[in-house]
């Protein structure tokens, strides 16, 4: 998830903190992070299709903790699959299916500990599980939004619009999307590590870099939208970005170094950058879709960017956002048979 090694790399921009530091403020939460943590505890039940609400209890305990410290939470849930991540998602689904079968085999052999380890590795949070949590959040008066696509893009948009002051997550993609304040490693007692984008200036290697340069370094090091060229991590990507003016020229430097750059890589990294810049998100004020950052004169025609997410009519976008419509099928949840 996210950019491997990015959070340790930006340690100069982080400091210890506590959730009470955000008392009186609205903070967004990457909700699937908590859903997955809760699901790990009941992985066997989920893998064996046994009824369970343990993940709901875990989620609500964390939600109440935020309220206890005076924080107004805004829970943001992932929506439908993004075209840019189709390859990544298909590979993850294949791996989960294999691990589930391995786990069931071990379970039937009474090797419960090993089976549980496999079940934890194949945990998948579904829109119906998110819907179950949302219904409980509604009962307790918590606010929420289901993103049309990715929660991290939605959180970045909400922060840029002043709807939230910070975002709680474990996903370093939020940094690439441009979030200014991120609460990482939040524990059950409220302690956390706070990322402050303004403190990047302390970093001797990228202190003077623009957001675009940081984004390009992360893309070249490998992200969910495009894998890296073999042998290229953050350190080497930093070198190529520092010596180039855009992604194509950075990729040409890789070719000059005789790296195994695959065919079409130039186009793939540019699509990744456009996805980070213009992914579709939900605007709660207009109740319609928007872009994570506004389109500018450098943006290609929308017809050339299907990978940023399908445009949804206002009725569908709002229905997804308020958890009335399934974000994958667009059907009302009431019509979905479990």
What is each stretch, according to the model?
Residues 98-99, 107-109, 199-201, 260-264, ...:
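Short, intrinsically disordered/low-complexity patches at protein termini
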Residues 30, 195-199, 313:
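Helix N-cap / beta->alpha transition motif
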Residues 2-16, 21-150, 154-158:
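Noncatalytic, basic helical substrate-engagement surface that gates or grips nucleic-acid strands
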Residues 109-121, 182-192, 265-278:
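Hydrophobic transmembrane alpha-helix bundles
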Residues 18-23, 205-338:
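Non-catalytic nucleic-acid-binding/docking modules located in mid-to-C-terminal regions
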Residues 123-266:
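Nuclease catalytic cores that cleave nucleic-acid phosphodiester bonds
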